[in-house]
């Protein structure tokens, strides 16, 4: 568990499942999906079907919830792009729109990056988004990440092409950024 005042990231517990399902899979077209890879299909699933997968959700290292004042607002996650070389990609979802543009994503990602560098033998963390998600690109910039790749016009959404954006951060850059942020 990592804490920044009223914001907490922590492993998912069984008591969190219903709220997490409501935020992520209860609706066919949730508002957050317009920003989180909307070019990939999203389907609502029943709570029963969601619970059938609970062993892959509860107390996992790669998928934690974000809480603000005890309310679940989203999740942070990671996956291995190539585990033998320690190439990890991370993600974040703020599902409750009341918490958009309030700095919660930046703060949660800060805690998550700390956690990843503190617990895994990584030299780099990164994420992939699309040029239509300006808030996510801004989070990367605020955290000192480098634009490592821009694949032009390869994402198609609502009749328009967008770029795929890949941002990354090296451990030594993070340590320098954290030092500057503390000053």
Language-model regions: role of each:
Residues 54-60, 145:
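Short loop/turn motifs at secondary-structure junctions and domain boundaries
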Residues 29-52:
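Conserved GNAT-fold acetyl-CoA-binding loop/helix
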